[in-house]
Amino acid sequence: MPEVSTDDLDERQVQLMAEMCILVDENDRRIGAETKKNCHLNENIERGLLHRAFSVFLFNTENKLLLQQRSDAKITFPGCFTNTCCSHPLSNPSELEENDAIGVRRAAQRRLKAELGIPMEEVPPEEINYLTRIHYKAQSDSIWGEHEIDYILLVKKNVTLNPDPNEIKSYCYVTKEELEELIGKAAHGEIKITPWFQIIADTFLFKWWDNLNRLNLFVDHEKIHRM
């Protein structure tokens, strides 16, 4: 694996780069494990390194979507606006368990607490709805990027928030119209949004949003959408 200096990066975020992500093939079959750092180096991504991830979309009971702005300390896509929570299940027994994506949903519960301070009892895995998966690749800069099989998870619930400033610069609940305005600002270069959030907003998000009480219509655990 290539050696890249992390001396100028945020110390806490560098520590997280030692976490072990789950390596998968293009059909999401587990083939091993690798550090978060190595999974996010463009040099490895160009060789085909692919890992498992998830994206949470949390709506409150007013049907507003919780967005976050990633902190400037983040190594990939710092300062970008994105969906509620985006991270990775780890290569450990609890989060490797694949039946009904329970391992991924446990990882989502863990990261909702770590990033947004949401008490774990407020988002039990059984209330995190697994819809489908997308496969995408994106560069953050010349060194870092993403190449993921991304599990799409939806939650509809009012939650308690206490964000970690090392993870999150700001957050807000938005209506559909407010999100469209935000996407417009990104198109004009006024703000930045993450590529996976842009992809999902351009394809599926508004259809899901219109049917939050009928999400079963959109459950597809067989297909991996190639983006």
UniProtKB/Swiss-Prot annotation:
Protein name per Swiss-Prot or TrEMBL: Isopentenyl-diphosphate Delta-isomerase 1
Binding-site residues, substrate: K36, R70, K74, S87
Main location: other
Modified sites of kind N6-acetyllysine: K176
Subcellular localization: Peroxisome
GO process annotations (BP): cholesterol biosynthetic process; dimethylallyl diphosphate biosynthetic process; isopentenyl diphosphate biosynthetic process
Residues forming the catalytic site: C86, E148
Presence of keyword Acetylation: yes
SUPFAM superfamilies in the cross-refs: Nudix (SSF55811)
Self-association and partners: Monomer.
Necessary cofactors: Mg(2+)
Pathway: Isoprenoid biosynthesis; dimethylallyl diphosphate biosynthesis; dimethylallyl diphosphate from isopentenyl diphosphate: step 1/1
Residues engaged in binding Mg(2+): H40, H51, E146, E148
Organism: Bos taurus
Entry GO CC: cytoplasm; peroxisome
Molecular function terms, GO-annotated: isopentenyl-diphosphate delta-isomerase activity; metal ion binding
Cofactor note: Binds 1 Mg(2+) ion per subunit.
Protein purpose: Catalyzes the 1,3-allylic rearrangement of the homoallylic substrate isopentenyl (IPP) to its highly electrophilic allylic isomer, dimethylallyl diphosphate (DMAPP).
Keywords for this protein: Acetylation, Cholesterol biosynthesis, Cholesterol metabolism, Isomerase, Isoprene biosynthesis, Lipid biosynthesis, Lipid metabolism, Magnesium, Metal-binding, Peroxisome, Steroid biosynthesis, Steroid metabolism, Sterol biosynthesis, Sterol metabolism
Record field: catalytic activity: isopentenyl diphosphate = dimethylallyl diphosphate
Highest taxon of the lineage: Eukaryota
Gene from which this protein is expressed: IDI1
UniProt EC number: 5.3.3.2
Protein family according to the UniProt entry: Belongs to the IPP isomerase type 1 family.
Residue span(s) of domain Nudix hydrolase: 49-199
UniProt cross-references to PROSITE patterns, sorted A to Z: NUDIX
